[in-house]
């Protein structure tokens, strides 16, 4: 679920996903189009693509299970669809963490009119 995604971003990247990525670049937040503006925005693009491959459950609403083992998030549970959502969220949170140094405030609340370039395929 999106609330779990927020929790994973806090645990892994150490910052609020809603605050920092809720409306960032061309892909972070609702929707997405155009060309990712930087590495952090690309994390959101890849996350959107990952959610797009999920079938049989709702990535934004369905709750998944995970554990923390030696500081790492381990996705679990018996439902392969929900496990896939967890992996999408975990990978995005790791991507945010690994690209924190590229985060640029100029892409915060970036106008959609600046995201008109042709989108690349997933």
From Swiss-Prot:
Q: Name one GO molecular function term.
A: calcium-dependent phospholipase A2 activity
InterPro entries xrefs: PLipase_A2, PLipase_A2_Asp_AS, PLipase_A2_dom, PLipase_A2_dom_sf, PLipase_A2_His_AS
Q: Name one Pfam family in it.
A: Phospholip_A2_1
Instruction: Indicate the residues that form the catalytic site.
Output: 47, 89
What is this protein's record name?
Answer: Acidic phospholipase A2
What SMART domains does the record tag this protein with?
Answer: PA2c
The superkingdom of the source organism is Eukaryota
Cofactor(s) needed by this chain: Ca(2+)
Function per UniProt: PLA2 catalyzes the calcium-dependent hydrolysis of the 2-acyl groups in 3-sn-phosphoglycerides.
Q: Which residues form a coiled coil?
A: none
**Disulfide-bond pairs as recorded:** 26-115, 28-44, 43-95, 49-122, 50-88, 57-81, 75-86
**EC number(s) recorded for this UniProt protein:** 3.1.1.4
Coarsely, its chief localization is secreted
Q: What class of enzyme is it?
A: hydrolase
Query: What's its catalytic activity?
Result: a 1,2-diacyl-sn-glycero-3-phosphocholine + H2O = a 1-acyl-sn-glycero-3-phosphocholine + a fatty acid + H(+)
Q: Where does Ca(2+) bind?
A: 27, 29, 31, 48
Q: Which GO terms describe its cellular component?
A: extracellular region
